[in-house]
Amino acid sequence: MRVVILGSGVVGVASAYYLARAGHEVTVIDREAGPALETSFANAGQISPGYAAPWAAPGVPLKAVKWMFEKHAPLAIRLDGTRFQLQWMWQMLRNCTPERYAVNKSRMVRLAEYSRDCLQALRADTGIQYEGRTGGTLQLFRTQQQLDGAAKDIAVLREANVPFELLSPAELKNAEPALAAVSHKLTGGLRLPGDETGDCQLFTTRLAALAESLGVKFRYNTPIDGLAIAGGKIAGVQCGSETVRADAYVVALGSYSTNFVANLMKIPVYPLKGYSITAPIVDEAAAPVSTVLDETYKIAITRFDQRIRVGGMAEIVGFDKTLRAARRETLEMCVNDLFPGGGDTSKATFWTGLRPMTPDGTPIVGRTPVSNLFLNTGHGTLGWTMSCGSGQLLADLISGKKPAIQADDLSVHRYLKEVAGQTRPAYA
């Protein structure tokens, strides 16, 4: 079967790899000059199935009000003038109940755990290297309230049989030796030994090369103007004056997926702006050995070979990609507070990207009401974590195979309802 994939981020490239491995003739189209040059370029570098959780959580609405008055707040909101933003925030608010949080987190963990299994198999099969480490992740708590609040996440981890360790301040140094100097600032930590880290952009670039070796064609620097429709199906992709035709089409355009399919269906994928800095290591003993997540500032600090990546925060501001100096200041403050002297933040590169987020946190993977159109988008801050599993799942669906995990609650159909024979958004 001929399959066209729109988007060459980590999710699009993973989809291409698994589809090619299943025997399909795959073409990837992207406007950029190469793979992983937008959202996948400089993310936090974590592969964290155990920390797969929705931003829509109990207590977040009240926290959001408090964060409005804090200098280093992890969340910021600025109205972009669209009705869609207001609808999306309202639906996110509705998902902040304990019941919905539990459902959303459980299915996110399901996909993320499966994706890690797929990644491990990929690594065993191909030997792909991407500055990866398998030292686990460590969530750091600065207050007793944060530590107590982790109970709901631990319950989900237990139910999903995800290994974890609850560490006291004195035990943190066993996972991250450099934290011994700052343990007095912390009340404890939640460590997930099965999580991994690495450079997502490097991973995506090398996975694209593996996909090419399987026959995948990559068409970069190519405009993607729209979908040609005939007889209720997709008849091709309009790329300038050319129409690229296939048997099946996959939209993996991240935050841009919503507008791209708007004439066919409404999907609630909104850009969640994040930031990162990447600093050279200057003192090995003072640097992290794996990755930590600062629960207070929602910032991840990740070790690469000779670099430290610091990433996080969320701004609900539309498609604005302005680099804000105040956000860099927050990232530098966080890493220098926990790992003082480990990296030279004065020489750090500064980046921003738009994560494609759904209001319930779960990505949209699978079939759509259009028989030959598939979606693989909405992974939020967990694009790399979920990429291999999402790609394999999509390849199974397109190939007519039963996926290895439950997939019906991952598709766009959870957001759509039929009204008078037409598809309408259930969230409107």
UniProtKB/Swiss-Prot annotation:
Pathway: Amino-acid degradation; D-alanine degradation; NH(3) and pyruvate from D-alanine: step 1/1
Gene Ontology CC annotation, any one: plasma membrane
Enzyme Commission number(s): 1.4.99.-
Enzyme class, UniProt record, top EC level: oxidoreductase
Keywords, ordered alphabetically: FAD, Flavoprotein, Oxidoreductase
Cofactor entry: FAD
Catalytic activity: a D-alpha-amino acid + A + H2O = a 2-oxocarboxylate + AH2 + NH4(+)
Gene3D superfamilies with a match to the protein in the record: D-Amino Acid Oxidase, subunit A, domain 2, FAD/NAD(P)-binding domain
Family membership noted in the UniProt record: Belongs to the DadA oxidoreductase family.
Protein name: D-amino acid dehydrogenase
Provenance organism: Burkholderia multivorans (strain ATCC 17616 / 249)
